[in-house]
């Protein structure tokens, strides 16, 4: 499909001519005597603002008769003489981003992005097919574009298009979940985006309108007259859990033939659709004869799976991998009959943080714990922890490889004592808990499934020997038709015995063949591969299917187990056959934690040294699992191998298909080393393992009664049930939840047939940032009248009164449904998690002695107030935020002032000030990267300017680990690169411009030269604590990038 919106964008060289040419238009004089003038092409985005009230075009809307073509043409000609857009002409094929240019014009250059454009119109010029790339290099937020009515005389905002900074499917899903009245198409012009509406009604009307548009598109598709740029379907996806919207979304695919034939006005068609959705829902629920059993079953599935798009064959055949990833073909349709309409309106509330006009004097005057609340069980609402985790094919076989970092490979006594102490200590239960969460394995299976479905539909062609081909073989047991491309036979049989270990083994294979032969096909006829520690590993069947009729020698030896004695015989027996191979992969576990002792430890160490020697003796390249990656073990292996062989590479590898919190690593063994370094002294994989952690997982705490205690120490779901008819109890419960939760979901619960049995369930997950902000509330006297402390614990003294929540009560509370649930967990990417860790470490590092003496908090670059997580204990201390994005304003009720200006590090830091400068000193305000030397100089300025009793925390990225990376897969999360002589290292984080990492030795020198300056390193303990408290599960990048990101992120503490 071709992007029609891109085709509307014109060459910058032709923009002057465009701005003097009268636009095409459509005109009508409506039955209500209103002028309706709609400009076509790029000019349809123009908003006729009050700046043009003196033009003829403005005054046309007030004429109470039908206009002539001459009047309209004359008015448009005059308008084009006054209309302008910011631009810079560039010759060649540079195009002009018309949508963004029009947006800046329409709002009078009043937002931050429009100001950037006004100052530098060249940002609107682009090559290729990504017109937003330049803008997203300068901003780290989603891009908001307002859309107005098609009639140029309608200046009201209809909705907002939100172009997403996270330009992935996962980013779209997160945005839909964040914005309650939002939807997205199944394909995206320009860049992935969603549509955000101001109300449920506007969202519903949009979904109905696109349903009607889809019926017309469907008629064209049936006659094979689809136009360039047509989507497979015009219907949209929404994540709002609204009963009536789900009814409508579920019935639309079944009515595409019928809706087109209903010759009604659009409003009448929408009313009819709303009514008919109720009819089908009742029929399906009650199993009456209105619909067949097959349609009933399909309808209920579509109702419950509202995030999936269901397509008739004509639309399904146009679907490809660039579309919304969750789709299904249907073959059924239903006939139509009409009944009366009714609607149900569930409510999802976003509680306000902008408190300027929303908080009034506290009510009631009594402490919360003296109020009486009615509580009833709400067992209808289950707690769901099996959330979706997403990954792509390109990330499926990612890996990072570290080289030795020390000239010496001597396993010292200190190293042994450290390793033995760690061996005797049990693993963290919290780590084991997170590793065994179902989303991890499901995400791997889902990638394979998506490739399978795309091939079966004919939407993609998969080349033989490609990564996609390998994904198919992990999903299919038999039934692939392999030629130049791979097809799927009708009698295909799916694989049932796929597990997490299989995915690791396949990723080991990919790493090994890429190391041997470079990038390209993953099939090499005649390859010889051996697995140790397995005899019937499914990975062997996967590779046999992958190779098909091409020659492959593959064999496995040994059952899975622990220790030397169980394996030595089987492996030695195998080697008596003189098996020489290209690749040898060992998946033998070595950690025996039953009755650990020094004797067992020595036995394991000896066995692993023996095993690695066997591998490199019999293979060109080997990968050996290391269950306990300690400096002692790695140097012992290095010493043993280097004493017996010459020029052997012994590198540490982490794989993307390992469990996200795993300790284990793989040793990559190969011949031909040119390194002078042989040992390990500071590797992040070893550092993480050697931490001794005894952290227990915490089950989510469900609070179902009113409590005034503020709890920071447990993941908490608040679920309150109150009498729906008692407005006082309802109001107070809602306000209590608004202190703890950024989102509240309400549901009506009827336990009797009369109003005496009407209750409302209110639920929401604790949001730490929300709590930290709302705890700061005052009543306007600069005294925190809401909080009090007792024995080190915080309690709410009174309830804040949030006006907007009470005003929304008439909209209804919604109701429960069959698959209703509260989600207890969320997926978090590695950078977002480490940012949480930074805040947590800072909060623990602030000296207790300073908590009472600090008079202000300064946050640099804190537009999203994330740093509030770091200062939640300082809820009485005023906050000053400095960020160039946004507008200057005061939030007096929460003691926060926002200053839209650049913070000058040359300014003196007042006495008794806490300064937070996280994720800012490596970029200028225009997002231009700053060198390591300049970053060090900024820290020196802070040191020289810090006042008495003040303290500063500055986050930096250091190159201490980057210099020891041999190879890492390109990725969108944390990508490190180096200059030619590997003296300067850069990191690209989450798609931003690559920035220089601070030189490690210069940081050490900085600490040495200045008293009161310390380096704080992040620990794995901090990671697990953050995950436990937030109920966040690390995404697929965790397994191979977490160690690296942790070791590369330092906090510099500066005390005055």
UniProtKB/Swiss-Prot annotation:
- What's any one GO cellular component for it? viral outer capsid
- Which keywords label this protein? ATP-binding, Capsid protein, GTP-binding, Methyltransferase, mRNA capping, mRNA processing, Multifunctional enzyme, Nucleotide-binding, Nucleotidyltransferase, Outer capsid protein, S-adenosyl-L-methionine, Transferase, Virion
Where can this protein be found? Virion
Q: What is its main location?
A: virion
Q: Pfam families annotated for this entry?
A: Reov_VP3_GTase (PF20790), Reov_VP3_MTase1 (PF20831), Reov_VP3_MTase2 (PF20832), Reovirus_bridge (PF20830)
Q: Does the keyword ATP-binding apply?
A: yes
Annotated disulfide bonds: none
* Catalytic reaction list: a 5'-end diphospho-ribonucleoside in mRNA + GTP + H(+) = a 5'-end (5'-triphosphoguanosine)-ribonucleoside in mRNA + diphosphate; a 5'-end (5'-triphosphoguanosine)-ribonucleoside in mRNA + S-adenosyl-L-methionine = a 5'-end (N(7)-methyl 5'-triphosphoguanosine)-ribonucleoside in mRNA + S-adenosyl-L-homocysteine
Q: What is its EC number?
A: 2.7.7.50, 2.1.1.56
Give an example GO molecular function.
mRNA guanylyltransferase activity
Which family does this protein fall into? Belongs to the orthoreovirus lambda-2 protein family.
Q: What does this protein do?
A: Outer capsid protein involved in mRNA capping. Catalyzes the last 3 enzymatic activities for formation of the 5' cap structure on the viral plus-strand transcripts, namely the RNA guanylyltransferase, RNA-7N- and RNA-2'O-methyltransferase activities.
Protein name stated in the entry:
Outer capsid protein VP5
Organism listed in the record: Aedes pseudoscutellaris reovirus (isolate France)
Its gene name is S5
């Amino acid at each position: 499909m071709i992007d029609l919106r891109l085709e509307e964008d014109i060459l910058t060289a032709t923009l002057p001519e465009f701005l003097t040419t009268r636009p095409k238009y459509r005109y009508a004089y409506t039955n209500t005597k209103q002028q309706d003038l709609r400009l076509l092409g790029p000019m349809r985005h123009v908003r006729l603002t009050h700046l043009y009230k003196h033009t003829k075009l403005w005054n046309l809307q007030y004429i109470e008769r039908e206009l002539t073509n001459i009047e309209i043409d004359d008015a448009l000609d005059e308008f084009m003489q006054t209309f302008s857009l910011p631009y810079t002409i560039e010759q060649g094929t540079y195009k002009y981003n018309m949508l963004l240019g029009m947006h800046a014009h329409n709002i009078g250059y009043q937002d931050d992005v429009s100001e950037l454009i006004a100052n530098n119109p060249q940002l609107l010029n682009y090559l290729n097919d990504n017109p937003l790339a330049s803008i997203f290099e300068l901003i780290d937020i989603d891009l908001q574009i307002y859309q107005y009515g098609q009639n140029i005389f309608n200046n009201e905002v209809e909705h907002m298009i939100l172009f997403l900074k996270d330009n992935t499917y996962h980013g779209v899903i997160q945005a839909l979940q964040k914005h309650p009245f939002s939807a997205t198409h199944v394909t995206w012009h320009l860049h992935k985006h969603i549509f955000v509406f101001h109300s449920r009604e506007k969202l519903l009307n949009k979904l109905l309108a696109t349903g009607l548009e889809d019926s017309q598109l469907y008629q064209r598709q049936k006659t094979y007259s689809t136009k360039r740029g047509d989507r497979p379907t015009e219907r949209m996806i929404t994540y709002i859990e609204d009963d009536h919207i789900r009814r409508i979304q579920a019935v639309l695919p079944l009515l595409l033939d019928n809706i087109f034939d209903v010759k009604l006005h659009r409003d009448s068609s929408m009313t009819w659709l709303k009514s008919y959705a109720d009819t089908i829902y009742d029929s399906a629920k009650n199993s009456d004869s209105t619909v067949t059993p097959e349609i009933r079953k399909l309808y209920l599935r579509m109702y419950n799976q509202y995030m999936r798009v269901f397509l008739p064959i004509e639309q399904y055949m146009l679907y490809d991998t660039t579309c919304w990833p969750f789709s299904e073909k249907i073959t059924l349709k239903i006939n139509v009959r009409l009944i009366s309409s009714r609607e149900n309106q569930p409510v999802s509330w976003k509680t306000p943080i902008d408190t300027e006009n929303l908080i009034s004097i506290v009510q009631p005057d009594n402490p919360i714990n003296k109020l009486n609340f009615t509580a009833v069980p709400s067992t209808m609402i289950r707690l769901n922890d099996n959330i979706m985790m997403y990954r792509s094919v390109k990330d499926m076989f990612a890996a990072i490889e570290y080289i030795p970092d020390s000239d010496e490979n001597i396993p010292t006594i200190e190293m042994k004592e450290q390793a033995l102490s760690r061996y005797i200590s049990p693993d963290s239960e919290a780590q084991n808990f997170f590793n065994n969460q179902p989303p991890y394995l499901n995400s791997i299976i889902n990638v394979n499934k998506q490739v399978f479905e795309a091939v079966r539909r004919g939407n993609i062609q998969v080349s033989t020997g490609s990564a996609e081909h390998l994904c198919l073989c992990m999903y299919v047991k038999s039934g692939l038709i392999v030629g130049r491309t791979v097809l799927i036979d009708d009698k295909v049989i799916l694989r049932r015995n796929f597990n997490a270990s299989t995915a690791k083994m396949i990723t080991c294979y990919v790493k090994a063949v890429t190391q041997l032969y470079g990038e390209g096909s993953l099939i090499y006829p005649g390859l010889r591969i051996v697995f140790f520690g397995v005899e019937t590993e499914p990975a062997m069947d996967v590779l046999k299917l992958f190779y098909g009729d091409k020659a492959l020698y593959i064999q496995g030896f040994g059952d899975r187990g622990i220790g030397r004695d169980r394996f030595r015989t089987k492996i030695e027996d195998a080697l008596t056959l003189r098996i020489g191979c290209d690749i040898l992969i060992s998946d033998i576990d070595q950690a025996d934690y039953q009755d650990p002792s020094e004797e067992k430890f020595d036995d394991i160490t000896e066995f692993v040294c023996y095993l690695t020697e066997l591998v490199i003796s019999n293979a060109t390249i080997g990968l050996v699992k290391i269950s306990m990656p300690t400096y002692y073990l790695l140097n012992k292996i290095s010493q043993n191998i280097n004493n017996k062989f010459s020029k052997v590479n012994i590198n540490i590898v982490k794989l993307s298909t390992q469990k996200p919190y795993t300790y284990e690593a793989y040793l990559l063994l190969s011949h031909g080393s040119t390194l002078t370094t042989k040992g390990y002294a500071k590797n992040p994989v070893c550092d993480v393992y050697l931490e001794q952690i005894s952290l227990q997982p915490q089950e989510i705490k469900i609070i179902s009664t009113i409590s005034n205690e503020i709890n920071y120490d447990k993941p908490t779901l608040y679920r309150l049930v109150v009498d729906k008819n008692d407005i006082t109890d309802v109001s107070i419960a809602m306000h209590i939840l608004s202190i703890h939760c950024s989102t509240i979901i309400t549901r009506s619960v009827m336990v009797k047939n009369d109003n005496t049995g009407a209750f409302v369930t209110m639920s929401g997950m604790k949001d730490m940032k929300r709590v930290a902000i709302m705890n700061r509330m005052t009543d306007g006297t600069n005294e925190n009248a809401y909080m009090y402390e007792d024995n080190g614990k915080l309690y709410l003294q009174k309830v804040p009164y949030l006006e907007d929540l009470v005003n929304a009560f008439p909209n209804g509370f919604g109701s429960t449904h069959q698959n209703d649930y509260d989600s207890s967990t969320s997926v978090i990417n590695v950078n977002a998690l480490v940012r949480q860790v930074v805040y947590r470490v800072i909060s623990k590092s602030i000296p207790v002695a300073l908590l009472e003496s600090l008079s202000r908090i300064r946050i640099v670059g804190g537009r999203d107030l994330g740093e509030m997580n770091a200062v939640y204990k300082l809820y009485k201390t005023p906050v000053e935020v400095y960020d160039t994005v946004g507008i200057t304003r005061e939030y007096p009720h929460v003691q926060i002032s926002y200053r839209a200006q650049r913070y000058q590090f040359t300014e003196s830091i007042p006495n008794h000030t806490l300064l937070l400068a996280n994720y800012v000193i490596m970029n200028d305000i225009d997002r231009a990267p700053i060198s390591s030397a300049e970053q060090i100089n900024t820290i020196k300025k802070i040191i020289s300017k810090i006042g008495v009793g003040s303290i500063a925390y500055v986050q930096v990225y250091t190159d201490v680990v980057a210099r020891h990376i041999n190879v890492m897969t390109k990725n969108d999360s944390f990508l490190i690169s180096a200059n030619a002589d590997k003296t300067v290292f850069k990191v690209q984080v989450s798609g931003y411009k690559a920035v220089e990492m601070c030189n490690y030795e210069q940081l050490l020198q900085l600490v040495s030269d200045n008293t009161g300056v310390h380096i704080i390193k992040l620990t794995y303990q901090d990671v697990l604590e953050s995950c436990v408290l937030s109920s966040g599960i690390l995404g697929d990048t965790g397994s191979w990038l977490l160690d690296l990101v942790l070791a590369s992120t330092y906090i510099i503490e500066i005390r005055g």
